[in-house]
Amino acid sequence: MKHIPRKRFGQNFLTDDGVLHNIILAIDPQPQDTMVEIGPGLAAMTRLLLDGVNQMHVVELDRDLVERLKKTFDPKKLIIHSADALQFDFSTIPVPAGSKLRVVGNLPYNISSPLLFHLAEMAPHVQDQHFMLQKEVVERMVAEPGSKTYGRLSVMLQWRYHMELMFIVPPTAFDPPPRVESAIVRMIPIEKPLPCDQTKLEQVVLKAFSQRRKVIRNCLAGMFSEADLIEAGINPQMRPETISLAQYVALANRL
């Protein structure tokens, strides 16, 4: 029986064999990998990953798809977690000593940003992440200071990860086709992020970008004096999108 994609789950199923092949090449699954796929859907990518790994985990919210997966795959090869990825504790997935988790998925575009922040909590225990996301989101993730797309997502994720836009995927590669272009991003956790309290960095970045058209002196008024900004190497007349990650970290360390 054909599964009807559900809007509330943000379901757009990848159906293009060429794109799937390129994703698998980028991931390069190895037999001993501890692999977890978020939102396997109709298992187009799952099947190809299982050709390369001995066993893998999937996290799927749609109960109909969970039942389909259970009927299709050997439970010793595919371990299914019927759960919301936003609430799922990825640390519960057993990983052999000396190994780290590899995370992949065609992420639902309607929850992509909160899901990326949720996964960032697991960064020290992750080898890498390969995700299909809305192209615009990936461009924001990898944006450099001074660009229009540079913002909170850029700063917070670049503090945690080395990131690369691998390639762009057209809407025609999906069923149903989304209204936007998609892209594959590779995320490799930084072993030693710049020393900083994450909560303080979040506070500074959130306040700075809440009024991105203003100069940073006005954005952060009440949090930092003009002298604080200068001592952190920041011209008070700069705008939030021109300030580097290192400069935001320097500010957070002054709180």
Swiss-Prot record:
Among Gene3D superfamilies, the record links this protein to: Ribosomal RNA adenine dimethylase-like, domain 2 (1.10.8.100), Vaccinia Virus protein VP39 (3.40.50.150)
Where does the record say this protein resides? Cytoplasm
Q: What does this protein do?
A: Specifically dimethylates two adjacent adenosines (A1518 and A1519) in the loop of a conserved hairpin near the 3'-end of 16S rRNA in the 30S particle. May play a critical role in biogenesis of 30S subunits.
The positions annotated for binding S-adenosyl-L-methionine are N12, L14, G39, E60, D84, N106
The protein's name in its UniProt record: Ribosomal RNA small subunit methyltransferase A
Q: Enumerate the NCBIfam families for this protein.
A: ksgA (TIGR00755)
Q: Which Pfam families did the record assign?
A: RrnaAD
SUPFAM superfamilies (alphabetical)? S-adenosyl-L-methionine-dependent methyltransferases
Originating organism: Herminiimonas arsenicoxydans
S-S bonds? none
Record's PANTHER family? DIMETHYLADENOSINE TRANSFERASE, DIMETHYLADENOSINE TRANSFERASE-RELATED
Q: Which GO cellular component term is one of those annotated?
A: cytosol
What is catalyzed by this enzyme?
Answer: adenosine(1518)/adenosine(1519) in 16S rRNA + 4 S-adenosyl-L-methionine = N(6)-dimethyladenosine(1518)/N(6)-dimethyladenosine(1519) in 16S rRNA + 4 S-adenosyl-L-homocysteine + 4 H(+)
